[in-house]
Amino acid sequence: MMQNIKDEAYKTYQNVKDEISSHLPQSAPEPTGPPFKCAIFGCGGINFGTAEGPWNNSQKLELVLGHRLQVVALLSPHKSSHERVLKQKAETEYASSYANTREFYSADEYLEYLDSHPEEKPDAYIIGIPPETHGSTQKGADLELAILKRFPDASLFIEKPISAAPVEDAFAVARRLPSESVISVGYMLRYLKTVQKAKEIIKEKNLKVVSTVAKYNSAYIHNSKKFWWIMSESGGPVVEQGTHFCDLSRYFGGDVEIDSIKVNRVEWDDPSGKLNAMPVDEKTIPPEERIPRFTAASWKYKDGGVGAFTHNITLQGAKYDTCIEVQADGYYLRIVDLYEEPVLYVRSPDSDEEKVYKYPNDDPYYSEFKIFLDAAEGKGDKNLIHSDFLDAVKTYELTKAITEAK
């Protein structure tokens, strides 16, 4: 029975993957210019792709920079991870971008190397490592500050979650960042054309947001990374996964009154919390470390509106179900299917019929990296970056508060 479920889910995944790929840009005109040096921290899925979605930071670097890309350093604690990644890249059209990559096994080792070889300073640092290893002022988790202490004008692309430290410690990092640095945090959904169109409508019509409602229904059967199912390692599904929709909620609604947050959950041991196609053996996880199946949260925004958010771990197969709604006087804006084929529906005072906005082949990951890399190179305005470190810490604060609410 379990194998049949997994087999069917895998077939669904392959179909969805092919469909997604057909809508993403596969190539771009070859960029021209001098070599652009990148150091990549982490050999995991966010930097080099997974079966679960279109995220793949190295691929976006290749698409934006073309053969200008030179990956000068690759960091991971495991030699086998280096070998796997470099072997894969050696078989692609961008093999030359990885031909002279130096391998390092810790941030300290790499930064000490740069101390004695400052001429090898990269043009950008791509940080896609577990949150407990960065985003803090504490030794061993102070990667951003360690880099910027040496190179105050460094350009850092940092994946979410921004930290695993206490929230105040993450805010302390934000306060210590030099103004000349260029920092972008990987909340790519902000770059969707549907999201930007919704923001444009709100601004043009001078609307005050009354409410946001965000829904994230996760497909879990392929999520076999055990750490994801352990609260203390992943931070929980809201911090690790639902963060994108908490972030979009803030993007539309503004800063949150943290003390106003109210939460209800379906826990793993509730009658409706049993999952029949678990990809990991949950018996090996201590009961107090098991994650909730459903989380519902609500809060007040500082501007007076109300936010609501739900995260659900019940879908099988591969396709996620996502939606965010924004309401203001006379206007109802709704964006659906944000990971695959986003569509914006807008009802306005002009008509009860919704106006539909679609943007085929929109790749927010590409847009995100294009803006960041242009800013890093001095060709673009860093104010065009939609998510900086401080803003990402505010999203982290919201997700932590939801996770820790009793």
From Swiss-Prot:
Domain of life: Eukaryota
Any one Gene Ontology cellular component term annotated for this protein: cytosol
This protein's UniProt keywords: Cytoplasm, Nucleus
Molecular function in Gene Ontology: nucleotide binding
Subcellular location: Cytoplasm; Nucleus
A Pfam family: ox_reductase_C
Broad class of the protein's primary localization: cytoplasm
Matches recorded under InterPro entries: Gfo/Idh/MocA-like_OxRdtase_N, Gfo/Idh/MocA_Oxidoreductase, NAD(P)-bd_dom_sf, OxRdtase_put_C
PANTHER family for the chain: D-GLUCOSIDE 3-DEHYDROGENASE (PTHR43249:SF1), UDP-N-ACETYL-2-AMINO-2-DEOXY-D-GLUCURONATE OXIDASE (PTHR43249)
Sequence similarity: To S.pombe SpAC12C2.04.
Name listed for the protein in its UniProt record: Uncharacterized protein UNK4.17
Native organism: Schizosaccharomyces pombe (strain 972 / ATCC 24843) (Fission yeast)
